[in-house]
Amino acid sequence: MKQTKIKLLCLLLAVLMLFSLTACGKEKTADSNLIKLGDYELLYKGACIMEDSDGNDAIVLTLDFTNNGKENASYLWSVDETLMQNGVELEAATVFADYDTFETVIEGQFTDVAPGATVEVRTAYLLQDTTSPVEATFEQFLGKKSGKITIDPSSLNRETPAADTTGGEPP
C-alpha cells in the first residue's frame, strides 16, 4: 500500500512538472507599442511635432503597418484612426515632407502592401496644445479589433521637413 502511494505521488509530481514546462514555452512578452487588428499589425515607433501648412503645431506619428492577410492592402483602407486630446477629436493636418514636391508625411498610407510585408506610415493631426496627453485609437476599418496608445506631446521633439537637396529654401 505504501509503495502504491509513493508511485502515485511520483506520477503526480511528474505531471505537474510537465505542465509547468509546457507553460514556459507559451509565454510571450507583450509589446505595448504593438497593436494587432485582425490581419494587420501596427507598431508604434514614435512621434514628433511638426508645423502644418498653416504654421500650426501638429503631432506626427510614425508606425510600421504589417499586412498578415492573404491579399494586398493599404493602411488607408485597412485602419481607422482617431486621435483625442482634452476629450476632443483632433483634426487631420497637412504636413509637408518636401515643400518642392508638395509631398505630405502621409504619402505612405496609400502604398499597397503585399501579404507578409511591412511599410512605414505616418499620420498627422493638429494639436490643441503641446502639453496635454493625446490618445490615439486604431481600429480595423471593417472589423471589431482596436488598440490604443497614449502620447505625451511635451516629451516630443520638434522636427522640420527633410533638408532640401536642390538648394532652394522652404517657404
What are these regions (language model features)?
Residues 119-151:
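Short, surface-exposed ligand- or partner-binding patches at beta-edge/loop junctions that are enriched
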Residues 1-11:
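Bacterial N-terminal signal peptides that target proteins for export
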Residues 28-55, 171:
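Low-complexity, acidic Ser/Thr/Pro/Gly-rich terminal tails and inter-domain linkers that flank the onset
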Residues 59-67:
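Short, well-ordered beta-strand segments enriched in hydrophobic/aromatic residues
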Residues 160-171:
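Ser/Thr/Gly/Pro-rich low-complexity, disordered linker/stalk segments of secreted
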Residues 20-23:
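C-terminal motif of bacterial Sec signal peptides marking the signal peptidase cleavage site
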Residues 30, 108-109, 122:
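A structural connector/turn signal
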Residues 53, 66-117:
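The feature marks short-to-medium sequence segments in extracytoplasmic or secretory-pathway proteins
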